[in-house]
Amino acid sequence: MQQTILAPDTADEALLTPQQALLTDDSEAILRFAVDALSAGMGAALVMLTGIRGGAARAVGAQMVVREDGGYCGFVSGGCVESAAAFEAMAALACVEDRVVRYGEGSPWFDIVLPCGGGITLHI
């Protein structure tokens, strides 16, 4: 699988908002992204799709990794919740606390609706 590395908007500043840093859904590359972040002294969070209600774009076990600077790689949906999930992961890193987040059906957020009409549960 071909991988594309995307540069942040500004090279001189740390990312303040989540931004995809590596475009891949290969689990080995996603975990390597985490190892590289940790080796560089940066915090990183693993986000895993652990539940599906109705339909979903990805299977249970899909992963993404989010660095403390907001850079992320991997997918847990068809692209509709990755940025929101990255914000949650950054918050989890900041308070050093795991969390469970739901999007779509059964979620507390009315403005994040999955195109497939279902819902997903993520563990961070």
For the regions a language model picked out, list residue spans one by one:
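Segments forming oxygen-rich coordination pockets for charged ligands
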Residues: 1-124
